[in-house]
């Protein structure tokens, strides 16, 4: 709530005004932006606030009760690196609170791992980095993630892998990563990157640390651009379904806050 002070003559009145619900986007590095997620939130008129709290032990977050939803983006750190990045602990606490209250929450890559570990899943190093385009297989369907094709080739960029939280619904997997997407309550986690559009990919490939990872995994900038051009059109329907659905859930949740 915000306080609005009005004055008529010598009389002053203080009125409690409901703040506009926002979707909180937690970003860990400048180039891991929300891309298509943000576009879908803006398309239906939702306000967003983007913060990077990884280095803050006690981050000054917006009032949780006034949030319409939460997005946790990717980054190069480990989901449990609390000593080096104390803000990740606050993000895990936020994830648990969102699920407990039914508030929509979406995690991508590191965000997927933060949500899963916050809900009790185990984190470990993958057998090898999964970087570039590779297929995922559908395991189950849900309105949050309606992958109609049995297999899709998506963009990956991670070293760690996470298990499935108890009571979580496994939605997709790959040959090297058993949990590529899952749902638990109001949470959706995706290990891969549906949010990346062409301009965001260019930002990734301008970032030296990303290029270093790509080359170490045997890839190249030209190859990745060619693969993006090949697969992106096939991925757009799923990206639209996932992110417009998340935006709609945030919008519905915002309406409950305004009552």
Would you name each region that the model predicts?
Residues 32-36:
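Short N-terminal binding/cap micro-motifs at the start of the first secondary-structure element
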Residues 196-259:
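Acyltransferase
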Residues 3, 13-14:
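Short, positively charged and aromatic/hydrophobic N-terminal segments
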Residues 98-122:
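Catalytic nucleophile loop
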Residues 119-200:
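Pocket-forming structural segment of enzyme catalytic cores
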Residues 38-106:
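Flexible gly/pro-rich beta->alpha loop and the following alpha-helix that scaffold active-site loops
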Residues 19-24:
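Extreme N-terminal starter segment of soluble prokaryotic enzymes
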Residues 25-30:
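N-terminal, positively charged, Ser/Thr/Ala/Gly-biased leader segments
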């Amino acid at each position: 709530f915000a306080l609005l002070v009005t004055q008529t003559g010598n009389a002053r009145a203080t009125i409690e005004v409901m703040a506009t619900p926002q979707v909180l986007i937690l970003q860990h590095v400048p180039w891991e932006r929300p891309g298509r997620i943000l576009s879908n939130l803006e398309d239906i008129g939702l306000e967003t606030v983007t913060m990077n709290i990884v280095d803050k032990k006690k981050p000054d977050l917006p009032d949780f009760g006034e949030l319409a939803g939460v997005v946790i983006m990717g980054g190069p750190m480990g989901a449990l690196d609390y000593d080096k990045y104390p803000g990740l602990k606050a993000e895990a606490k936020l994830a648990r609170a969102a699920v407990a209250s039914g508030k929509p929450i979406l995690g991508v890559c590191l965000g997927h791992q933060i949500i899963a570990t916050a809900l009790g899943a185990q984190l470990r190093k993958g057998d090898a980095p999964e970087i570039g385009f590779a297929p995922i297989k559908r395991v189950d369907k849900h309105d949050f993630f309606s992958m109609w094709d049995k297999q899709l080739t998506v963009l990956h960029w991670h070293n760690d892998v996470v298990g499935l939280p108890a009571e979580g619904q496994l939605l997709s997997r790959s040959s090297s990563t058993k949990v590529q997407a899952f749902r638990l309550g109001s949470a959706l986690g995706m290990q891969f990157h549906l949010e990346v559009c062409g301009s965001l990919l260019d930002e990734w490939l301008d970032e030296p640390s990303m290029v270093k990872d790509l080359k170490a995994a045997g890839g190249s900038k030209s190859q990745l651009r060619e693969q993006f051009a090949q697969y992106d059109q096939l991925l757009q329907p799923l990206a639209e379904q996932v992110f417009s659905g998340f935006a709609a859930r945030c919008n519905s949740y915002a309406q409950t806050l305004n009552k």
